[in-house]
Structure formats: structure tokens, C-alpha cells
């Protein structure tokens, strides 16, 4: 059973937080540092390989204590117990959310470990050159065909961990990703590949996703024509296609033999699926040892979330500070700013994880909420962001909370020895910029410690709150811990807001309407019950296509 919750905005702690926000809302971040000596020590949290500095958030010690009380009042401890007990915390689909079980090393996950062993066999054969194409060639390229969680997580993690050393004798293939339904990505990827040495991963929880199946069909047709084979050739499908899904019957119907099928379960949400067989592209990048380290890091954070008191609990404190910003300071946007180029795809991954989970306006009880929930999440690699939208952060009119990510150690591998000094200098430059931007956003021109009077157009007001996360180094284990941290943060926020973070009904109706719009595009002059704007656009497209 899941705990019941009362009306959030009528709680006594919520009302106290509203009063405190009115009292402290006009304070500048610099005031907090003056009023609370040793503030950084009180607002820094650590876990294995990760430090989180919340001191540049516009939250006082009093506000923090009240927020912790809010977590207690909302029953976060009972909700956490329900999550890890396998209760049906996904109330609209009557499902549990046991993605945490995918990284549990205990015997209760025997079925999961069985799939990991199948993954291990596939990964070893590919990396050691033993997986052969239908004409006997070793695999050099792997194409991941998937969309949403079947791409965002694997793409992000594989890119981040690409420099992870492999075992002796292992050679990682080149990875490619195709998700767009218009065919542009799959077309560009395939025209650069040799079908004799290409392996295609078809990743779809339902194995009915239109985007994925159209791309998979295109890849199968390309492979068959290039090799002079029929599209249902069993040897071609056995040597060049692997399916990953919760629906084995549908994989079989498409043509993927059972020996090439990896499975996961309906209680694994797409945005939580990189820990499952959906993470095969990650394993092909770091090897199975590296993939197991990724799982171990996530399990470390699971234990941290379950065992640490709230005021020492990284996911919970991140969630509570976000709630403070959104609901009490009216800051409804957050920029994710990694100052390590390997985390290039982390902002896009978090956009899905957070906005698809908590972008809800209806409570678990089915009532409209009367408070804000998930903020708009966006971001870019820090140095690029400085030349793109930092102008708005520093001198614009929108309050934005920022999240900086950096690594303490980099370029220690022997592979970089030829340019170690230069690369270490670049790493220091990146970290210096990260620290400088967080200081400037917090304190404005006061950070310059200068008495010069500046004209208005050169002024920096500061007072933009930020969190800084420092990884000891970027490794499979620390990345696993970081990603699980964000998952638990999202869950904790959902508990505070009383919403279901494990469904995504907001993406479903558009798929139905798209089917209707296909008929409109095919015959825009026919009789259709559709709005004038959409009909006019369909006719415009038809007109342009008729003249090409």
C-alpha cells in the first residue's frame, strides 16, 4: 500500500515556508554568506566520489530545516519504503517502479542477473571480434535504433564514458544512434556504413513505437538489398540484428530470433531503463565490467538515499532546494551546465527524466494542483553556454537556478601522456571558468572586489542561485551514482508535490492525433474534422510536394 497525503498548501509547514519566503525573499545571496559564517561547510554534502555545494542557493539554515520538516510531513520516508518494497507507486497504471532492482546485487534480482549474463555474452563476442556478420566479417559499427529513453540514456552515458579503458584484446565498435521518425538520421548513418560489418540494435519497450519500427524497417531493407538477401533471411537477422524489449513475441514477429533477444519488464519506465538491457550500447562502450560498475555506482546512491537522514541526503536536499526555488521564490527554470565536455548529453537526458516525470498538473488523487511543479530544464556544456545564453543569466529579467557540474581529476590516463601538461591546463581553465561563473551569478560585480563605478549596462546584479556538483572523476561508477541521484531527487519532489512521476500520459494523445493527420496529409481536400490552421498547413505541404 502507498501512503495517503493531505492537501499540500494547507499544511502548517508549507504556510511557515510561505511566511519565511516573504521575510527572506528580498535578501541577496551575499547577505546569506555574511549572516551565516561557515555557510559552505553547513551546505555541502558528500557521497562516494561526489560533492554537492548548496551554499550558493538562496536558502537559509532556517528554511532548510523547515523544508526537511516538510519532507517528514509529506511522508517521504514511507514513500521511499513503498518504492523499495515494490508497491504500486505508479497509481495510474497500477505498476510498481522497480528500476532500482536493476542494479541490486542481491539474490532477489535473479531474473535480472540472467539478462545481464546474456548481455555479457553478446558484449564479449562483439568486443573480442567473435560476433560475425552473415558473410563472416567482424562487427565494426553498431546502430542503436530507439527513441526517448531507449536513446537518451544510452547516448548520454556511452558518450560520457567513451574514454573508459577496455580489457586487453577488446576493441569497441563505433556507435551510432537513430531516433528521428523523418528518416534523416537513419539515412545519414547507414550511407556511411558497411552492411557486412554493421550490427543493429532495435530498442523499444513495447516494440510498437512507430518511430523505432520505421527506422528498423529501413535498416533491415538497406541491409538486405546491400547484401543481396531477402528481408526475412534468417541468417542476416541472426547475424545483424538484436532486439531489446519487454515484448518478446513482438520481437519474434518482426524477425529477431530468440537467441538475439534481450528482455526487460513493464515496471521499467523508459526514462529509467538504461540500467536494463536498453543499456547495451553503454556496455559495448565500457565493457561488461564497466557496465557493472555503472550499476554498482547507482546502487551506492540507492543505499545513500535509503539510509541517510534528510539533511545529509543528497537527492532529498536537491529536491527540497528545488521546491524552495519553484514554490516559494518563483524561480521556474533551471539550467544544467556541465563543465566537462563528456557530459554533453546530460542536459537532454535530464530534460526527459525531470520534465516527463514531474511535468504534471494533476495530483495522485486526480485533483488539479494549485501550485507549480516541475521547472523548465535546459542546458549546454558550460563554455558553449557562456557564449550562448549566459548573457540572459547575468543581465536578463528571468530568474534562473543553475546547476554546475565539474570533475576534480582528468587526463590522468596514460593515453594522454603525450599532451598531459597541455590537457591538464585546459582542464584547469574549464574548472576556473565554472567557479568564476558560479561566483558571478551569486554575487554579481561584488565578486570583482572593485570600487570602480560601472555604467548600468555593465552591471551584474548577481543573486542567481546555483548548485555546484564536483565528481572526483568521471567513471562508470561515479556516473551511475550521479544518475541515480537525479532519479531519487525526482521521486522526492514528486512526493512533496503529491504527483505520480512514473507515468507520461501527456505524450499519448499526440500519437493518436498523428494517425488522423496522416489521412489529412494524404488527401487535404477531403472531408476532415480538423481545425482550419492544421488543414491549411496540410494543403500548403501538399501544394509544395506537387511542384517538386
Swiss-Prot record:
Annotated GO CC locations: cytosol
Family matches, as InterPro entries: G6P_Isomerase, G6P_Isomerase_C, Phosphoglucose_isomerase_CS, SIS_dom_sf, SIS_PGI_1, SIS_PGI_2
GO biological process: gluconeogenesis; glucose 6-phosphate metabolic process; glycolytic process
Matches recorded under NCBIfam families: PRK00179.1 (NF001211)
Subcellular location: Cytoplasm
Intrachain S-S bonds: none
Species this protein is from: Alcanivorax borkumensis (strain ATCC 700651 / DSM 11573 / NCIMB 13689 / SK2)
Record-linked SUPFAM superfamilies: SIS domain
Function per UniProt: Catalyzes the reversible isomerization of glucose-6-phosphate to fructose-6-phosphate.
Organism taxonomic ancestry: Bacteria, Pseudomonadati, Pseudomonadota, Gammaproteobacteria, Oceanospirillales
Protein name per the record: Glucose-6-phosphate isomerase
Family that this chain belongs to: Belongs to the GPI family.
PROSITE patterns the record matches: P_GLUCOSE_ISOMERASE_1, P_GLUCOSE_ISOMERASE_2, P_GLUCOSE_ISOMERASE_3
Keywords: Cytoplasm, Gluconeogenesis, Glycolysis, Isomerase
Primary location group: cytoplasm
Amino acid at each position: 500500500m502507498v501512503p495517503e497525503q493531505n492537501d499540500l498548501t494547507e499544511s502548517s509547514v508549507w504556510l511557515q515556508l510561505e511566511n519565511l519566503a516573504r521575510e527572506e525573499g528580498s535578501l541577496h545571496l551575499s547577505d546569506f554568506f555574511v549572516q551565516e559564517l561557515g555557510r559552505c561547510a553547513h551546505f555541502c554534502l558528500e557521497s562516494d566520489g561526489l560533492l554537492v555545494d548548496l551554499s550558493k542557493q538562496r536558502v537559509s539554515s532556517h528554511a532548510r530545516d523547515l523544508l526537511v520538516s516538510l519532507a517528514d510531513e509529506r511522508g517521504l520516508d514511507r514513500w521511499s519504503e513503498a518504492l523499495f518494497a515494490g508497491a504500486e507507486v505508479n497509481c495510474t497504471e497500477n505498476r510498481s517502479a522497480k528500476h532500482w532492482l536493476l542494479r541490486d546485487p542481491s539474490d532477489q534480482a535473479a531474473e535480472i542477473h540472467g539478462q545481464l549474463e546474456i548481455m555479457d555474452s553478446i558484449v564479449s563476442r562483439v568486443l573480442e571480434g567473435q560476433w560475425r556478420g552473415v558473410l563472416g566479417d567482424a562487427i565494426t559499427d553498431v546502430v542503436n535504433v530507439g527513441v526517448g529513453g531507449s536513446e537518451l540514456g544510452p547516448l548520454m552515458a556511452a558518450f560520457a564514458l567513451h574514454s573508459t579503458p577496455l580489457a586487453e584484446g577488446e576493441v569497441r565498435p563505433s556507435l551510432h544512434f537513430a531516433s528521428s521518425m523523418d528518416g534523416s538520421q537513419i539515412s545519414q548513418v547507414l550511407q556511411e556504413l558497411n552492411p557486412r560489418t554493421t550490427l543493429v540494435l532495435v530498442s523499444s519497450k513495447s516494440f510498437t513505437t512507430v518511430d523505432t519500427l520505421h527506422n528498423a524497417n529501413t535498416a533491415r531493407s538497406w541491409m538486405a538489398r546491400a547484401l543481396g538477401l531477402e528481408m526475412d533471411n534468417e541468417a542476416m537477422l541472426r547475424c545483424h540484428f538484436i532486439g531489446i524489449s519487454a515484448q518478446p513475441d513482438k520481437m519474434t514477429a518482426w524477425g529477431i530470433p530468440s537467441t538475439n533477444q534481450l528482455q526487460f519488464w513493464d515496471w521499467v519506465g523508459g526514462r529509467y531503463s538504461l540500467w536494463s538491457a536498453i543499456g547495451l550500447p553503454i556496455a559495448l562502450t565500457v565493457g561488461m565490467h564497466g557496465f557493472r560498475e555503472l550499476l554498482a555506482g547507482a546502487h551506492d546512491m540507492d543505499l545513500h538515499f535509503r539510509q541517510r537522514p534528510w539533511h545529509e541526503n543528497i537527492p532529498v536536499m536537491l529536491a527540497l532546494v528545488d521546491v524552495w526555488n519553484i514554490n516559494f521564490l518563483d524561480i521556474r527554470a533551471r539550467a544544467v551546465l556541465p563543465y566537462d565536455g563528456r557530459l554533453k548529453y546530460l542536459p537532454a537526458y535530464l530534460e526527459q527524466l525531470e520534465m516527463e516525470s514531474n511535468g504534471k498538473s494533476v495530483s495522485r488523487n486526480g485533483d488539479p494542483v494549485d501550485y507549480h511543479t516541475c521547472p523548465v530544464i535546459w542546458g549546454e556544456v558550460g563554455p558553449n553556454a557562456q557564449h550562448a545564453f549566459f548573457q540572459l543569466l547575468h543581465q536578463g529579467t528571468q530568474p534562473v537556478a543553475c546547476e554546475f557540474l565539474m570533475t576534480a581529476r582528468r587526463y590522468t590516463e596514460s593515453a594522454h601522456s603525450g599532451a598531459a601538461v597541455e590537457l591538464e591546463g585546459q582542464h584547469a581553465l574549464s574548472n576556473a571558468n565554472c567557479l568564476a561563473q558560479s561566483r558571478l551569478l551569486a554575487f554579481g560585480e561584488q565578486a570583482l572586489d572593485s570600487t570602480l563605478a560601472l555604467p548600468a549596462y555593465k552591471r551584474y546584479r548577481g543573486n542567481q542561485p546555483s548548485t555546484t556538483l564536483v565528481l572526483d572523476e568521471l567513471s562508470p561508477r561515479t556516473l551511475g551514482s550521479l544518475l541515480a541521484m537525479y532519479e531519487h531527487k525526482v521521486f522526492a519532489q514528486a512526493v512533496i508535490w503529491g504527483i505520480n512521476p512514473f507515468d507520461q500520459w501527456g505524450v499519448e494523445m499526440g500519437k493518436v492525433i498523428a494517425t488522423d493527420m496522416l489521412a489529412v496529409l494524404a488527401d487535404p481536400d477531403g472531408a476532415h474534422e480538423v481545425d482550419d490552421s492544421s488543414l491549411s498547413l496540410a494543403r500548403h505541404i501538399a501544394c509544395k510536394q506537387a511542384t517538386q
